[in-house]
């Protein structure tokens, strides 16, 4: 979450933080372990304004997705418990898509926000679209069995054209950012895609604004 947040903020954008139910967003303390913590995480720990947004987030019912140029769905374990399961989130993703704005993006488990969204015929909105998320192989490496939804499995099930990078030696670090054919969805494979995915979203927004 911290990487895309500061990418957008440092580019001069107003950045709001919301959650499905609103209120305080739980953060896994393991995110700040010395071998995982990023420069942006350290910046967050010294940023009371950002911390306040996490403690007092509005619910998605309190915001209009079409008021935003970009919407980014964060990764981590949390989204596996409520993104794909939320009928309301699926409805708002579909409505935002058909309104023509915003550009929507995600990294890692964040892509689960898209799998339950439907098109006007009732079919999965992601069907046939290039998309990515953390791979099953990367989850298996860490023996992740406790999360209820896995991005690769759910995206494939919804008919997405799942893309991913692989590395013969260090596959856990392999990553890629992909854009769908309409340039409406930008998805990153895992947390290592945070910078690139946020930057690509802003690049597409700039191109749209220039037309």
Residue spans of the language-model regions?
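Short, thiol/selenol-centered motifs that function as redox-active sites or metal-ligating centers
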Residues: 106-110
């Amino acid at each position: 979450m911290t990487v895309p947040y500061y990418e957008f903020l440092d580019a001069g954008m107003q950045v709001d933080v919301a959650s499905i139910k609103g209120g305080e967003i739980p953060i896994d303390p393991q995110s700040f372990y010395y071998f995982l913590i990023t420069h942006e995480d350290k910046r967050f720990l010294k940023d009371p304004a950002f911390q306040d947004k996490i403690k007092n987030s509005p619910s998605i019912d309190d915001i209009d997705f079409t008021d935003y140029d970009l919407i980014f769905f964060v990764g981590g374990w949390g989204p596996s418990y409520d993104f794909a399961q939320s009928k309301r989130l699926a409805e708002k993703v579909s409505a935002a898509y058909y309104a023509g704005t915003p550009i929507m993006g995600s990294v890692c488990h964040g892509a689960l926000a898209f799998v339950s969204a439907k098109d006007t015929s009732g079919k999965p909105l992601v069907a046939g679209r290039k998309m990515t998320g953390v791979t099953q192989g990367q989850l298996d490496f860490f023996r992740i069995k406790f999360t209820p939804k896995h991005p690769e499995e759910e995206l494939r099930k919804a008919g997405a054209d799942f893309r991913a990078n692989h590395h013969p030696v260090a596959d856990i670090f392999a990553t890629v950012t992909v854009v769908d054919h309409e340039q409406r969805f930008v998805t990153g494979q895992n947390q290592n895609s945070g910078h690139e995915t946020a930057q690509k979203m802003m690049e597409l927004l700039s191109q749209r604004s220039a037309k």
